[in-house]
Amino acid sequence: MTSFKLVKYTPRIKKKKGLRKLARKVPTDRLLKFERVFKAQKRIHMSVFKAQRVLDEIRWRYYEETVMILNLMPYRASYPILKLVYSAAANATHYRDFDKTNLFITKAEVSRSTIMKKFRPRARGRSYSIKKTMCNITIVLNIVKKSK
């Protein structure tokens, strides 16, 4: 006869790897803290989850690498995000005189916006509601110092 030992179950907590990725790509001492460009776009007709899938790929990458990735992605969500990144880089070069080769995406986040409700007519005088979701996307570009 076998005996069983009761062990208390403790769930495993996943560690966040965002800072590790940043440390691998660019040392944090080379990121200039106050040299940032914020760009936000509100009410984009897209699901939060679809935008999040694209933003996870471009976070912690250089600008040129990001543009190349977004051009080659097959998702519909990549085009509005590409326009947003282009606009943020244009603002950085025009207003702050930053070089595009030194721009680095430190923050790319999406949040839920308003939901537009529509009704679709159905048989026997009924109607079904349709919820069109929208999202807000924020991109933060940071300038990286050249290593000496």
From Swiss-Prot:
One of its GO terms (cellular component) is chloroplast. The keyword Iron does not apply. Keywords: Chloroplast, Plastid, Ribonucleoprotein, Ribosomal protein, RNA-binding, rRNA-binding. GO terms for molecular function: rRNA binding; structural constituent of ribosome. Coiled coil: none annotated. One of its GO terms (biological process) is translation. PROSITE patterns: RIBOSOMAL_L22 (PS00464). It is found in: Plastid, Chloroplast. This is Large ribosomal subunit protein uL22c. It comes from Sorghum bicolor (Sorghum).
